[in-house]
Amino acid sequence: MMPRIKPLLVLCAALLTVTPAASADVNSDMNQFFNKLGFASNTTQPGVWQGQAAGYAYGGSLYARTQVKNVQLISMTLPDINAGCGGIDAYLGSFSFINGEQLQRFVKQIMSNAAGYFFDLALQTTVPEIKTAKDFLQKMASDINSMNLSSCQAAQGIIGGLFPRTQVSQQKVCQDIAGESNIFADWAASRQGCTVGGKSDSVRDKASDKDKERVTKNINIMWNALSKNRMFDGNKELKEFVMTLTGSLVFGPNGEITPLSARTTDRSIIRAMMEGGTAKISHCNDSDKCLKVVADTPVTISRDNALKSQITKLLASIQNKAVSDTPLDDKEKGFISSTTIPVFKYLVDPQMLGVSNSMIYQLTDYIGYDILLQYIQELIQQARAMVATGNYDEAVIGHINDNMNDATRQIAAFQSQVQVQQDALLVVDRQMSYMRQQLSARMLSRYQNNYHFGGSTL
């Protein structure tokens, strides 16, 4: 079962203000993510009452909705047959045959080799053992020569790196397209044209919609995949941000490869999202295909909209409402339900004990990293889902998946560093546990005193 996509892609929304301002950018997505944390819910309390005719009891009700993200999991193109006044277009395969002139040349060649044949015939008749040994040696030489070709091709496809692998696969793509479009006379002609014949580019330019993603020419793989998700419609900067996190492969007009490595835990990006400031992300000079990528384009996040500031404001608001017994709004409820830290308990318990609750503010960094890593993980999940729906070359998908796996490992490593801050959380837990025990002991003592006092007056 696929993991539930938490409504977190919206949080870090209240977090980022990017310069220059834009209607759709990383800032707006993080604000949406932050504002829609948790569930949209509505509840009614259970109750019991006695009427004139009867007694009544009802259990209350619960309504909860979480944010929905649309992911296009399957894309299908149906086959078709074109028929019109000019005829019917259908590809039924092809075959080749030799003509009379070729047959005559072949017979002449056989006759020119007649001396060798007569020699073999004489050996077979007089000394068959020698004939058998000669045939064995000839077969061995032929097998070795044929293996030279196949081993060369295998070396390209197995150990030659990404470029040879894509080169071999593109020859196959070219031949597939040529076969579907009936461009060459037969298989041998298509192999010739798609390799040394120089027809590969012109053939691949005729790729149908279902084959275009297989052609590694003039394509940015991650950009192409993200463009199929409506979540990124009109949000060029968010796509650039995701591409920076996951990395990509950019194929130029001649198949040249420009790799973009994953920068998931780039310190400048993490710091800017947590505390505000400037981070550098990959930027596309063209928003259509993103073939020209500038590696270090600055994106500015204001301090007020960074995660730490937003979380501090929310904690203060929740604390004040707890003191005044005011209901929490949806944003505050979502914030409490989205983090693994029992925030509400750490705010309310000290109020009940009459002590300072400043301890919770010591955990602002930890809470911020907890939410930020959820946001980044969900963006990577979106990217992984869209790559999986594409018809990309196997070698390309392998490289992209390696990039995203590397990004996931970077997040895990970063999380292990953040876990160090759990020491502070454990200290808070111990302090809160001790205070609750004290309160419980005081309440029990007061209850017992009241009980004995009440008993003595009877």
From Swiss-Prot:
Any matching Pfam family: TraH
Record-level GO cellular component terms: periplasmic space
Keywords: Conjugation, Periplasm, Plasmid, Signal
Keyword set includes Signal: yes
Signal peptide, first to last residue: 1-24
UniProt entry tagged with the keyword Nucleotide-binding: no
Record InterPro entries: T4SS_TraH
General function of this protein: Involved in pilus assembly.
UniProt name for this protein: Protein TraH
Source species of the chain: Escherichia coli (strain K12)
Lineage, broadest ranks: Bacteria, Pseudomonadati, Pseudomonadota, Gammaproteobacteria, Enterobacterales
Gene: traH
